[in-house]
Amino acid sequence: QIVRMIPTLKVNNRRLNELFYIETLGMKPLLEESAFLSLGDQSGIEKMVLEESPSMRSRKVEGTKKLARLIVKVENPSEIEALLARMDKIPQLYKGTKGYAFEVLSPEGDLVLIHAEDDIKDLKKVDETVTFSKDEKLQYLTAFDISVEINLPEETTSLLEKEEIENGLAFKQAQGSDLLVDNNVTWD
């Protein structure tokens, strides 16, 4: 049985990605060790790891990435508004029963959805301009959970049982030559 899943993202430029995940998404740096950066929330529990892999060892993904989307579910919806207030340019907004959500691309081109809903199907796209109030007290998110959507090559299924992964992983069929390469080959 899988007890806890901690996504590890391979990145080319850790510093650029570190700034994005900390300043834009409000994740707290927990431990920095050589090529690894552990990120979490105020609880101090590790939720995600960034692993720097320089271009002499890995390369950019050609075509579709294995990571379809990183989904961050925030416990306190008002913290999402505080994150949005810090941004110079507001990304794609959504609204749900608990509040706002947004989708943004990381420096590596990974799609990240930040929300507080029980079900992301409740989110509706917001097209009008919205202004958010700054919250100087918020430095890092109080509590959040991460799940991932993974692209699998067409005609492929996961070896994991649905009960094992609960809501932590979702699989989508996709096409792309790099969906079948080893983990150490690309930044994905």
What does each model-identified segment do?
Residues 1, 61-65, 138-143:
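Short, flexible turn/loop "capping" segments at secondary-structure junctions
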Residues 4-7, 27, 48, 67-68, ...:
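Short, structured motif recognition centered on aromatic/hydrophobic residues
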Residues 8-47, 51-53, 150-182:
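Core segments of cupin and vicinal oxygen chelate
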Residues 13-14, 75-79, 108, 154-155:
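Helix N-cap motif at beta-to-alpha junctions
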Residues 19-20, 78-85, 102:
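Short amphipathic alpha-helices within nucleic acid-binding modules
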Residues 50-78:
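A broadly used, surface-exposed interaction patch
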Residues 71-72, 148-150:
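Short, well-ordered beta-strand elements within core beta-sheets of diverse protein domains
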Residues 88-149, 161-188:
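Vicinal oxygen chelate
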